[in-house]
């Protein structure tokens, strides 16, 4: 089963509309250009002036007749009229006349005046004459077609010096300022390297500064978070009494052990009335004293054998044991 094609997107529709409108506009312009073939085929006034002819008359496809200083030759080209020198030599065209003619044509084109056209039967399609300039801008040279039987005339400048008709050979210009270009390139490279080094040093300093700032922030946070100096623990009176009772118990226990050891070594003797209350006649039993009820407040269990010197609050010194009999 064939999958259905998705509908075209609005973007594709817009592109299609633009393409169709462009095709329609191109066809309309082409039709308008085809409706006026005479206007498109008629050369411009500057082209006619370069051909040394008058402007294109209305409805014609070619330029008008030759202008006043020129005459039409056998090939249908407008060539300057030859003037014979007083000595009777070859006729030579004058370059000043051609320059004056071109200046007059340009001025006439700007002013809008045109020469009256001649009938169409005398109009021919001439070959364009080449208008060139010398290599160094010394003068204006007009490339004139040469007839088979007429020698090529040599134009003269206003100063009377002949202008050679040979092709001008231009030597390639030698590059100047090569050392200056190399020096500029070296300076540009040096500035680029210096800028890159300065940028790298600045980035390194910035990274180190940011690292130091982060370390300082971490140290400040740890200092603020750390607890202060440990304060002395507060001991309730009940705990103090419990500690004293434990010490008394430890003392009595040590005393009973010492008495038992002495009785095994020596014969039994009668004890004082004070000691008879604490131990029986055989001495096989240990008397334990109850320290009393614990307080209703905080209660803490301590090891009697633990060194209480580690406590910050000094405990009362135990009473000295009575002398052994």
Swiss-Prot record:
Residues 1-34 form the signal peptide. Strongly expressed in adult brain; especially in hippocampus, frontal lobe and temporal lobe. GO terms for cellular component: plasma membrane. Residues 138-175, 266-290 are annotated as: Disordered. Keywords: Membrane, Phosphoprotein, Signal, Transmembrane, Transmembrane helix. Its main location: membrane. It is a single-pass membrane protein. Coiled coil: none annotated. The chain crosses the membrane at residues 182-202. It is found in: Membrane. It comes from the Eukaryota. The modification Phosphoserine is found at residue 229. Residues 275-284 have a biased composition (Acidic residues). Suppresses oncogenic transformation in neural and non-neural cells and down-regulates neural cell proliferation. Might be involved in transcriptional regulation. Belongs to the NPDC1/cab-1 family. This is Neural proliferation differentiation and control protein 1. The lineage of its organism: Eukaryota, Metazoa, Chordata, Craniata, Vertebrata. The gene is NPDC1.
């Amino acid at each position: 089963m064939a999958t259905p094609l998705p509908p075209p997107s609005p973007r594709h529709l817009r592109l299609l509309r633009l393409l169709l409108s462009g095709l329609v506009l191109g066809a309309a312009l082409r039709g308008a250009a085809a409706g006026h073939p005479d206007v498109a085929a008629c050369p411009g006034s500057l082209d006619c002036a370069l051909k040394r002819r008058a402007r294109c008359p209305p409805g014609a496809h070619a330029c008008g007749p030759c202008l006043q200083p020129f005459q039409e030759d056998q090939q249908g080209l407008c060539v300057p009229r030859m003037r014979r020198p007083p000595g009777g030599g070859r006729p030579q065209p004058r370059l000043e006349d051609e320059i004056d003619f071109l200046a007059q044509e340009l001025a006439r084109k700007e002013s809008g005046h045109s020469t009256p056209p001649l009938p169409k039967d005398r109009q021919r399609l001439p070959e364009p004459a080449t208008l060139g300039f010398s290599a160094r801008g010394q003068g204006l040279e007009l490339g004139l077609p040469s007839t088979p039987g007429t020698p090529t005339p040599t134009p003269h400048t206003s100063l009377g010096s002949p202008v050679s008709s040979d092709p001008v050979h231009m030597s390639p210009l030698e590059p100047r300022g090569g050392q200056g270009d190399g020096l500029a390139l070296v300076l540009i490279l040096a500035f680029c390297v210096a800028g890159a080094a300065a940028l790298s040093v600045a980035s390194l300093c910035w990274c180190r500064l940011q690292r130091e700032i982060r370390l300082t922030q971490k140290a400040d946070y740890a200092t603020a978070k750390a607890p202060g100096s440990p304060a002395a623990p507060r001991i309730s009176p009940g705990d103090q009494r419990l500690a004293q009772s434990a010490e008394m118990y430890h003392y009595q226990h040590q005393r009973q052990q010492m008495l038992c050891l002495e009785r095994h070594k020596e014969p039994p003797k009668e004890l004082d009335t004070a000691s008879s209350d604490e131990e029986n006649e055989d001495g096989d039993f240990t008397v334990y004293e109850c320290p009393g009820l614990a307080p209703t407040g905080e209660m803490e269990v301590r090891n009697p054998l633990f060194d209480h010197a580690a406590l910050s609050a000094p405990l009362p010194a135990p009473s000295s044991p009575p002398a052994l009999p």
